[in-house]
Amino acid sequence: MTKKYNIAVIGATGNVGRETLNILAERNFPINKVYAIASDSSLGREVSFGEKILQINSLKSLHFDDIDIAFFCAGSEVSKEFIPKATASNCVVIDKSSLFRVDNQVPLIVPEVNLSTLKEFNTKNIIANPNCIVIPLAVALKPLDNEIKIKRVVISTYQSVSGAGKAGMDELYDQTKSKYVFGENDPKKFPKQIAFNIFPHIGDLNKDGYTSEEAKIASELNKIIGNHFKASVTSVRVPVFIGHSISVNIEFNDKIDAKEVEEILQDADGIVTISNNNYLAYISPVEVVGEDAVYVSRIRNDVSRDNTINLWITCDNLRKGAALNSVQIAEELINNYL
């Protein structure tokens, strides 16, 4: 008989929390009972879980003794306050905030890349889910690095507003609507107008000129893949609702060409490659909404630098960039560790 688990999704009314519930249902995760948890302001609301409707429960009233696995999807402050309570009750936590990602005692997992490090989870009973840009980057970069070591990476991200939560999506919608009726809608969630605009500012601005988002991406990539290369990152917010895209310039330590890169990626787990032989041979954000794969296209040689490749990565940031990755981690946990 298949063992079933009690699951809690904390932040169940947010973008990632709702998607986590959707994916748990889609993939028939063996659940005995599922708890949809959010702040007190969300009490009385309902969320979908497959064909079922779940009532929102309060985090403050949740008994972690009753929970086997908790998905934390509510940000670093909530994680900081409540994860110690969860782990003290022997609940395994999969945390989607940035709080534990660079903690050396907490594995930072992308299942296609570094599942072998998952065995370290029981040091703290916490597994960290990487940044929503780092996940597709790691899926694409690791199989290449396995073949020929990467020397450096230059990354420009084009991140949708859903990465900033429902408030970010609402702000894009409201500003767009206001522009069509000649109204004004001042930015609240974002530092500048997002409708019909882009800006290279995600997270806080650091003293070195990089943003906190850019620093996270570089440090998390090194933790997952290795410290033998450096990454220079520019993170850009774009007026797209769902779907992150990434322009990547990769310099290798040895000779490689675009054809070889394409062949390596075609054999890699979790990737769909688009050949340059096709007309419109690239994937845009609207095409990946609801998709689980990481799409890689525009694979080409950098004509300005030897041993260097350019490519374009696109994925659904709410699915593989967040919720799906964490559910895949949970599947591995119950198959081999719990």
Swiss-Prot record:
The active site is at 132 (acyl-thioester intermediate), 244 (proton acceptor). Pathway: Amino-acid biosynthesis; L-lysine biosynthesis via DAP pathway; (S)-tetrahydrodipicolinate from L-aspartate: step 2/4; Amino-acid biosynthesis; L-methionine biosynthesis via de novo pathway; L-homoserine from L-aspartate: step 2/3; Amino-acid biosynthesis; L-threonine biosynthesis; L-threonine from L-aspartate: step 2/5. GO terms for molecular function: aspartate-semialdehyde dehydrogenase activity; NAD binding; NADP binding; protein dimerization activity. The keyword Acyltransferase does not apply. Phosphate binds at residues 101, 216. NCBIfam families: asd_B, PRK05671.1, PRK14874.1. This is Aspartate-semialdehyde dehydrogenase.
